[in-house]
Amino acid sequence: MKYSKNESRQRRKIRISKKVSGTAERPRLVVYRSNLHVYAQIVNDLDGATLVATSTLALGKNESGLHCNKGGAEKVGIEIARMAKEKNIDKVVFDRNGYLYHGRVKAVADGAREGGLEF
């Protein structure tokens, strides 16, 4: 039986999570995208704690006209990098959450690199 697009993503996510884990020294940058918004958070898996988080939804309250396109996703990446720098986080492990490294997911990664995070 053929898997749906979301079921296939969930299966990829499980395979990736077996290999990728965040620590206190190098936490995990997780990206989630919906049809309307892009969410990013930095997680320490050993403690089970979210260190910083932001999204186009949160940024849209401050900036009028922020859309969930590649430009908005890049702003999310820049903002998550700024917030991480405030908490003295320089290096992260990128978790694409089962999505293809393309489009909005790639834009978040590029924005985070531009903001100073090291993958």
From Swiss-Prot:
Pfam families: Ribosomal_L18p (PF00861). The keyword RNA-binding applies. Coiled coil: none annotated. GO terms for molecular function: 5S rRNA binding; structural constituent of ribosome. Gene3D superfamilies: 3.30.420.100. SUPFAM superfamilies: Translational machinery components. Keywords: Ribonucleoprotein, Ribosomal protein, RNA-binding, rRNA-binding. GO terms for biological process: translation. It comes from the Bacteria. GO terms for cellular component: cytosolic large ribosomal subunit. Belongs to the universal ribosomal protein uL18 family. Part of the 50S ribosomal subunit; part of the 5S rRNA/L5/L18/L25 subcomplex. Contacts the 5S and 23S rRNAs. This is one of the proteins that bind and probably mediate the attachment of the 5S RNA into the large ribosomal subunit, where it forms part of the central protuberance. NCBIfam families: L18_bact (TIGR00060). HAMAP family: Ribosomal_uL18_B. This is Large ribosomal subunit protein uL18. It comes from Desulfovibrio desulfuricans (strain ATCC 27774 / DSM 6949 / MB).
